[in-house]
Amino acid sequence: IKSMEWLAEKNDTTFIGQSVLHSGNAIYNTLKTIDEEKRIEVPVFEEIQMGMCTGMALNGLVPICCFPRFDFMLRCMDSLVNHLDKMQHMTEGTFKPKVIMRTSIGAKEPLDGGIQHTQDYTMSLKSMLHEVDVVLLEEPDNIFTEFQSAYNADRSTLLVEYGDYYNEK
């Protein structure tokens, strides 16, 4: 919550995703104190959501693009891997959009969401992405500084959270 409140203080940030404005997943609880004017609720259309965030970033905003589960992010790999990650190269450095992405490895406690909702693709994405940093948030003590670093960076960052931590830590 502290990280999201800090990001919300920035004039150029907007939170976009599923259940960022209305309850429906654990990420919502980290955003419910954020002014509704800073949040854009979208339906389940991950590919379009990532494209929207890339466009917002190209226009000078810093979107915080929230995907409730890592497994759902697979739906936006074209926009992430072939567009956001390659934008700087494709434009010979003219465009360098900054998107802060949040996702979560689905929780297994108190209810196991099943294999299609609890996978960790961190290492796979680290090997595919060259202009987007991928950060696994392994300890709650590092979360705030990692979000600060993502905001202060001159590139996009994917921050991967553990869903179990929403209930445990």
Protein language model features and the residues they cover:
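Thiamine diphosphate
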Residues: 1-167
